[in-house]
């Protein structure tokens, strides 16, 4: 195979042994909460962004390979392969699931409404992205995929301005204390340590949105 790099995110050294994580000619381990890593990063927000900090690091530091992929310590792609331009190998595809309702049942749907408002402001009311979130029934979960580098750059250039606009709208200013304060307000009777990952949950749906509306996803596993 050509130049392929699959970035595997973890956050605790114990996970290396527990999940048998190791690097090889294709896989590169990345500790998402390592704030000493060289290069531009947002690893100090790993608690809230989860593996999205790895996406940012690879993109911002132009760690280019012909094909780039991502997974994390609990989910690995069943295969590693080359893909054509515009194609995307994903972990799996959930069909016949309401993207919006599935989010609404699990998280604070007002955050997703903020995302939809931003998309409508930027791309016009009833644009294909907000329509996907509101009416879509195909979900590509888990943020595990392989695509060509140019496609990945296009994804990041679309994704991160949306996430940072949500941060700004909610007055969070990329501040960990403000992120956890918001989670405690929104989920004061629930699992705050889980729900504080709002931006990661939003990113998961946005990545699915981009892959479904702009690319040709395929998977070894279809649910």
Give the positions of each predicted feature:
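ER/Golgi luminal nucleotide-sugar-dependent glycosyltransferases, focusing on the catalytic module
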Residues: 1-223
């Amino acid at each position: 195979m050509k130049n392929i790099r699959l970035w595997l995110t973890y956050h605790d050294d114990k996970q290396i042994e527990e999940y048998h994580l190791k690097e090889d000619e294709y896989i590169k381990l990345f500790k998402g909460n390592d704030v000493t890593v060289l290069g531009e990063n947002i690893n100090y927000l790993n608690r809230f962004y989860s593996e999205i900090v790895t996406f940012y690091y690879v993109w911002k530091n132009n760690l280019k390979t012909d094909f780039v992929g991502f997974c994390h310590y609990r989910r690995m792609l069943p295969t590693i392969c080359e893909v054509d331009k515009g194609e995307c190998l994903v972990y799996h595809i959930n069909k016949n699931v309401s993207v919006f309702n599935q989010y609404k049942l699990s998280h604070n749907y007002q955050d997703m409404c903020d995302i939809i408002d931003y998309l409508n402001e930027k791309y016009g009311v009833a644009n294909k992205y907000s329509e996907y979130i509101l009416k879509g029934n195909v979900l590509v979960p888990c943020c595990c995929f392989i695509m060509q580098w140019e496609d990945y750059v296009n994804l990041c250039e679309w994704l991160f301005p949306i996430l940072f606009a949500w941060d700004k709208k909610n007055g969070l200013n990329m501040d960990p204390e403000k992120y956890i304060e918001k989670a405690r307000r929104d989920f004061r009777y629930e699992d705050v340590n889980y729900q504080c990952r709002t931006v990661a949950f939003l990113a998961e749906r946005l990545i699915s949105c981009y892959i479904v509306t702009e690319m040709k996803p395929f998977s070894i596993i279809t649910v």
